[in-house]
């Protein structure tokens, strides 16, 4: 029995949590995500909502139900707007938006919070907030000295978005973190509109 348990324990250690947005409610998986990305990707995200993105392309490619033209795993882990219509936030230009992030396992690197056009997967304007280096530093994390502004912060909705983000599903606020040593990307998205 022990030889069977050890590989499972090792696997569990590789899929343990890393980070995600806690508030406002981030995109989550559902039927639309299964239809676009396949069950393998959705199961991976459901089993560990904070896992890194790098394992998803391989899972997607091996799933016969994966539709590359509908599921961009590098944007919100492929999670679809259609599963999150009840979670759309409405903001106004200039509004300050409080965001809370969970960091479970640190990997020092860089991070940013940006508004992303979901059709083109491009950042609109400049990042709303950026940590060019030193984000999620292991030494600080385990010493319980992680700067508070890495997990609880406010971003301001730009006043020059025009109508770009007036339709639900057109834009997301994306928290993006790259752990340099681990070479792993973590991301979480908030659906929103600007009224």
Language model features: what each stretch is:
Residues 1-23:
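Fungal secretory targeting signals
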Residues 12-13, 104, 118-120, 178-180:
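Conserved beta-strand elements of beta-rich interaction domains across eukaryotes
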Residues 18-125:
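N-terminal "mature-chain" segments and other terminal, solvent-exposed stretches
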Residues 36-38, 70-77, 164-166, 170-172, ...:
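Sequence contexts marking disulfide-bonded cysteines in secreted/extracellular proteins
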Residues 94-96, 108, 150, 166-170:
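Extracellular Ig-like/FN3 beta-sandwich strand-entry sites
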Residues 116, 153-182:
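Internal, hydrophobic beta-strand segments that form the core of beta-sheet-rich folds
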Residues 119-157:
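Exoplasmic/lumenal beta-rich domain surfaces
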Residues 183-195:
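Short beta-strand elements
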């Amino acid at each position: 029995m022990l030889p069977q348990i050890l590989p499972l324990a090792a696997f569990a250690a590789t899929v343990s949590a890393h980070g995600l947005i806690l508030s406002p409610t981030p995109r989550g998986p559902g039927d639309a995500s299964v239809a676009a990305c396949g069950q393998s990707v959705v199961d991976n995200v459901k089993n560990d909502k904070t896992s890194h993105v790098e394992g998803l392309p391989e899972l997607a490619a091996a799933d016969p139900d994966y539709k590359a033209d509908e599921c961009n795993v590098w944007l919100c882990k492929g999670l679809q707007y259609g599963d999150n219509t009840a979670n759309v936030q409405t903001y106004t230009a200039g509004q300050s938006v409080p965001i809370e992030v969970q960091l479970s396992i640190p990997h020092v690197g860089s991070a940013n919070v940006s508004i992303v056009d979901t059709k083109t997967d491009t950042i609109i304007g400049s990042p709303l907030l950026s940590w060019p280096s030193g984000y999620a530093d292991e030494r600080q994390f385990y010493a319980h000295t992680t700067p508070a502004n890495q997990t609880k912060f406010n971003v301001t909705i730009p006043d020059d978005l025009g109508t770009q983000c007036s339709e639900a599903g057109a834009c997301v606020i994306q928290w993006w973190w790259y752990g340099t040593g681990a070479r792993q990307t973590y991301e979480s998205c908030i659906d929103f509109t600007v009224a």
